[in-house]
Amino acid sequence: MKNKRLIGIIAALAVLVAGSLIYSSMNKPEAKNEKKVAKVGVLQFVSHPSLDLIYKGIQDGLAEEGYKDDQVKIDFMNSEGDQSKVATMSKQLVANGNDLVVGIATPAAQGLASATKDLPVIMAAITDPIGANLVKDLKKPGGNITGVSDHNPAQQQVELIKALTPNVKTIGALYSSSEDNSKTQVEEFKAYAEKAGLTVETFAVPSTNEIASTVNVMTSKVDAIWVPIDNTIASAFSTVVSSNQSAKKPIYPSATAMVEAGGVASVVVDQHDLGVATGKMIAQVLKGAKPADTPVNVFSTGKSVINKKLAQELGITIPESVLKEAGQVIE
């Protein structure tokens, strides 16, 4: 009798446990329906408006591809232009378990490339990926690296300089000696400028500390100043402008933010659009695309940005044809 009662109790308990398990499984979200949160490591070389716009564009591009806040975790770091931090942060981002890593600007991409040969590396705003030894071929990168390149439209810039300031004969190119992409841009700009009958004198600075003194020397030797896509110069562009205050030489930079901050004009690649394209490429790789087979997306044509207010202050007459074709006019 006791055994029958015990068996009954055990059976009842078994039913309760089974029912509980069934209820629990019915109310638990199916694992297969749970979306994996992508992990993306991002290293930005330095803070300045152009690179900040690229980072914003990356986030927007990811969102457009379905990777919104709840579907992607961004592990963001900024080396603030410190090369030693680039190496340390690159290793940290690789070790953090990210699905891939992104380098905004050439030094950041180079740091990440040195830190891993296996994890996908996506370049953002790399002017010369081949010259920077990041990829061997733009159409078929062949390794763990691909991305988006902001090739400087040097020929268009030379044409704009001649259209706005036809009396300019000698241009000073101000750039950082530590950035490989800047050297490549200067060589290309110089070649186009010389074909157009202009003389280009180059002025390289090792860091932001030498910008003021270098600009002071430049202004006594040149008719205008040209600045490539250069993170060192961009991060201290206000120093370039203030050091040129008395000489009032027209400055032709290579980014919209710098035209707004004291440049006369430029032909630029839209940095936000570049970031969006980078974000979409990140999404492709997250979905299974191989960097080795994913061509580098090259932005090679730009739009002109004119600082009309500053041009008038410098006595520069802007042809109507230039104004009509401008992508942006700052009044």
Kindly give the residue locations of the regions a language model identified.
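Short, low-complexity disordered leader/linker segments with a strong preference
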Residues: M1-A38
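An alpha-beta-alpha
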Residues: I58, T146-A193, P295-L310
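Structural motif
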Residues: K73-A95, A204-M218
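Flexible loop/turn connectors
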Residues: A257-K309
